[in-house]
A protein has these predicted regions:
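Short amphipathic alpha-helix that is part of the acyltransferase structural core
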Residues: 1-31, 157, 161-165, 169, ...
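Terminal substrate-recognition subdomain of acyl/acetyltransferases
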Residues: 100-185
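A conserved beta-turn-beta hairpin within the catalytic core of GNAT-like acetyltransferases
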Residues: 61-69, 79, 98, 143
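A conserved beta-strand-loop-helix scaffold within acyl/acetyltransferase catalytic domains
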Residues: 23-73
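Conserved acetyl-CoA-binding loop-helix of GNAT-fold acetyltransferases
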Residues: 74, 80-94, 118
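Alpha-helix C-terminal capping segments
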Residues: 6, 47-48, 88-96
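A short, internal acetyl-CoA/4′-phosphopantetheine-binding micro-motif in the GNAT/acyltransferase core
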Residues: 72-79, 106-108
Length: 185
């Protein structure tokens, strides 16, 4: 299994995958994704084994010991075959010098049994890979109730401070205030 960097010519096709793989309200607009790649705020790569099988978009500012997994998906034809776990191991190895942070749907906010079960399944998937839910944090990100998960811990910073430092370069202060609400308690 290998990775290859996403190049500028692939931004539109990548975004087509993102529209298929994520709910509309979890997607940044295309211009924002493109801008963040162009400004080197985002790092993106495909997981490949003779054919692209999935992708990840990461925010990893050089001056921080954190990285945010913004988007992570396995293409539909490769799901439920163990590739997601393998791809996540690649991400963990690639960013082994950092604490990785991600958001997952909050199971307690699910409105149906099906969405609850799906949210629980995703949280358990990340827990098997070594992530844990930060229990003292609740988040509403782009209107979605999320849990914040990390594969490490920093006693000196709150989840809100960590997420602020990761999202601010990508969104700017105005958008951060509009779309991100993280409560540490």
């Amino acid at each position: 299994m290998e990775t290859r960097n996403i190049n500028k010519e692939e931004y539109k096709s990548l975004y087509s995958h993102m529209k298929r793989d994520f709910p509309h309200n979890e997607l940044q607009p295309f211009f924002s994704v493109k801008r963040n790649f162009d400004k080197n705020i985002y790092e993106g790569f495909y997981f490949t084994e003779n054919v692209d099988m999935g992708y990840a978009i990461i925010t990893a500012p050089e001056n921080l010991k954190y990285a945010l997994i913004n988007y992570f998906a396995v293409f539909p034809e490769f799901r439920e075959k163990g590739y997601g776990s393998e791809f996540l191991k690649i991400i963990l190895n690639r960013y082994s010098d950092r604490i990785l942070v991600l958001e997952a749907d909050d199971p307690s906010a699910a409105k149906t049994t099906a969405t609850h079960d799906e949210a629980v399944r995703r949280v358990k998937f990340y827990e098997r890979a070594g992530f844990h839910v930060i229990p003292t944090t609740r988040a509403k990100i782009f209107g979605m109730n999320m849990v914040i998960m990390a594969n490490g811990q920093d006693e000196n910073l709150s989840a809100k401070e960590i997420m602020h430092s990761l999202y601010l370069p990508a969104l700017g202060a105005k958008q951060w205030l509009r779309f991100i609400d993280i409560i540490d308690f």
